[in-house]
């Protein structure tokens, strides 16, 4: 059974045993919506049309977005360093460019490389006349030393890159060559751009990632039996996916509504 916990992640992480986590899957609040400065740039929608008025706020926060408050990254890394199994434990962060910059600056010597999640749908239609719609999200991989990685190739019937007769040429002139027909069955290495449809379902957390995306990362950055921690678990999709893949999932969420939904699901 997954371990489903409610509360401030920085406080609950303090209660977990040292060197107990094999993989951190983190989707920390970016701070894009939950601030009064950002609210000033957001417009209230009426019947799908921007009114030009500020969105309604409560205590300086956009309604429904009180969860989007940045956590103390220094305190976060302090707990990560205590909890990680060893110096090769991967710490994976979903982020946009602005928040990703803050993540790197907070632990620059631990940053290893980035991945891109290429979504099926773009967002930001209201700004489509000013900038391209956003259809990707960054995934940053951190570790104290080289992050553990367990290669898992993709399989399928891959499209041929070419299929034609070729003419070889040397000092003796053109020489007929046999038809080139590469074998496109079998396995291929994964690339740094992950093409995967986004999912939007009523009742899910606003930033929930697809189960298949979590599975992609979990299978490549952990082994069966490992412990996976999601410190801001939202709908706990990462935790349930970890359990399905024979890992031990631990999720922490402050919001009572999402916490109770996860409890009901795990019962």
Residue ranges and their predicted role:
Residues 1-259, 267:
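Core catalytic lobe of class I
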């Amino acid at each position: 059974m997954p371990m489903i916990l409610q509360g401030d992640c920085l406080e609950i992480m303090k209660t977990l045993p040292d060197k107990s986590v094999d993989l951190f899957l983190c989707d920390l609040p970016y701070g894009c919506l939950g601030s009064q400065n950002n609210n000033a740039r957001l417009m209230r929608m009426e019947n799908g049309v921007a009114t030009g008025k500020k969105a309604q706020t409560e205590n300086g926060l956009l309604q429904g977005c009180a969860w989007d408050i940045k956590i103390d990254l220094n305190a976060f890394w302090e707990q990560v360093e205590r909890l990680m199994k060893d110096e090769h434990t991967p710490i994976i962060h979903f982020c946009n460019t602005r928040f990703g910059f803050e993540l790197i600056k907070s632990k620059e010597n631990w940053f290893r490389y980035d991945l891109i999640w290429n979504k099926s749908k773009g967002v930001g239609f209201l700004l489509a006349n000013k900038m391209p719609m956003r259809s990707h999200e960054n995934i940053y991989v951190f570790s104290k030393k080289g992050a553990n990685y367990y290669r898992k190739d993709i399989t399928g019937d891959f499209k041929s890159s070419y299929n034609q007769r070729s003419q070889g040429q040397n000092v003796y002139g053109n020489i007929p060559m046999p038809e080139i027909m590469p074998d496109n069955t079998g396995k291929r290495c994964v690339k740094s751009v992950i093409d995967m449809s986004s999912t939007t379902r009523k009742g899910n957390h606003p930033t929930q990632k697809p189960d298949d995306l979590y599975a992609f990362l979990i299978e490549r950055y952990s082994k069966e039996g490992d412990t996976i921690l999601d410190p801001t678990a939202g709908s706990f999709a990462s935790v349930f996916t970890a359990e399905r893949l024979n890992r031990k999932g631990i999720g922490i969420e402050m919001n009572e509504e999402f916490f109770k939904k996860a409890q009901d699901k795990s019962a």
